[in-house]
From Swiss-Prot:
Protein's name according to its UniProt entry: Large ribosomal subunit protein eL18
Record's GO cellular component terms: cytosolic large ribosomal subunit
Pfam families noted in UniProt: Ribosomal_L18 (PF17135)
Keyword Transport included in the entry's annotation: no
The organism of origin for this protein: Methanoregula boonei (strain DSM 21154 / JCM 14090 / 6A8)
Gene Ontology BP terms: translation
Gene transcribed to yield this protein: rpl18e
Length: 121
């Protein structure tokens, strides 16, 4: 018999439902993919350093991280980054590089179609 444990964080459960509904309404598969990754256990969430974002993102691009952005490394370009959480050092380094930190909810409101968004994990 397998154990099923539901998420206890109300922000996270509401976000998952919102992502699934938006995916269905706008036929945007990217939001369903993000919702699926957030339904996994917390230990499987992405932890992405700024050095990886700097390596794979281009200037002016929008990146989504289904997990936490960490502040290790340097960011030399301005990118929009949406994530579940940010470390304090990551937030300050992104702002110093003229980038933008946002929650997944904010990105969902700004871009419900999900066009031009890349997932990093």
């Amino acid at each position: 018999m397998t154990r099923t444990v539901e998420k206890t964080n109300p922000r996270l459960t509401n976000l998952i439902l919102l992502l699934k509904n938006t995916s269905r309404e706008n036929e945007a598969k990217i939001w369903r993919e993000i919702a699926g990754r957030l339904e996994t256990p917390n230990r499987n969430y992405a932890e992405v350093n700024l050095s990886k974002i700097n390596r794979y993102a281009q200037k002016g691009e929008t990146i989504i991280v289904p997990g936490k952005v960490l502040g290790s490394g340097v960011l030399d370009q301005s990118v929009r980054i949406a994530a579940l959480n940010f470390s304090e050092s990551a937030t300050s380094k992104i702002r110093d590089a003229k980038g933008q930190c946002m929650t997944i909810e904010q990105l969902l409101k700004d871009n419900p179609k999900g066009s031009g968004v890349r997932i990093l994990r």
